[in-house]
Amino acid sequence: MMKLYSLVIIATLAAAAFAATKQEIAAAALSGMVHDFEQYAKRAEGEEEPKRYIRCSKQLGEKCDLNCECCGASAVCEDYNYICKEKVSDNPVLDWFGQGLNAMGNAISRYYCDAE
């Protein structure tokens, strides 16, 4: 019976830890989309001709402004260094989940960039 209680406690703690990291990953994906919207709004409000962003014009590790410039379905433009990156977490399961969220966010924000 003691083992059952221990198993329940461990499962509860593991679920809580996974939920916290899942929220962090979702927040990171959302912040990438918000960054794209802000950049697009700044370009649209300005009087000068907005910069033309080419879809898939930057490889992983190159400088970028918007997510759609980075090549790869789950590649995003990192918020702080503004470089294309794909890895979300060191944990393979969380990384896979985060890349899925990135891919969904990229699918939504693709209209910012022109196709080549």
UniProtKB/Swiss-Prot annotation:
| Keyword hit for Zinc-finger | no
Q: Which residues form the signal peptide?
A: 1-19
Q: List the disulfide bonds.
A: 56-71, 64-77, 68-113, 70-84
Question: Tissue specificity, please?
Answer: Expressed by the venom gland.
Q: Where in the cell is it found?
A: Secreted
User: What is any one of the record's Gene Ontology cellular component terms?
Assistant: extracellular region
Q: Where is this chain primarily localised?
A: secreted
Q: What keywords tag this UniProt record?
A: Disulfide bond, Ion channel impairing toxin, Knottin, Secreted, Signal, Toxin
Q: Which domain of life is it from?
A: Eukaryota
Q: List, in alphabetical order, the Gene Ontology terms for molecular function in this entry.
A: ion channel regulator activity; toxin activity
Functional description taken from the UniProt entry: Ion channel inhibitor.
Q: Which family does it belong to?
A: Belongs to the neurotoxin 25 family. ICK-8 subfamily.
The free-text domain note is: The presence of a 'disulfide through disulfide knot' structurally defines this protein as a knottin.
Task: Provide the protein name.
Answer: Toxin ICK-10
